[in-house]
């Protein structure tokens, strides 16, 4: 059985990675995504 905190950590890491990717996309291609 997985620990609840392990799940939270895993989800938090995935969300953080996705957020970083989104920010990088916005910075790299400023107004090409309308």
Curated annotation (Swiss-Prot):
Signal peptide: none annotated. Transmembrane segments: none annotated. Keywords: Amphibian defense peptide, Antimicrobial, Cleavage on pair of basic residues, Secreted. It is found in: Secreted. GO terms for biological process: defense response. GO terms for cellular component: extracellular region. Expressed by the skin glands. Has antimicrobial activity. Belongs to the frog skin active peptide (FSAP) family. Cruzioseptin subfamily. This is Cruzioseptin-5. The lineage of its organism: Eukaryota, Metazoa, Chordata, Craniata, Vertebrata.
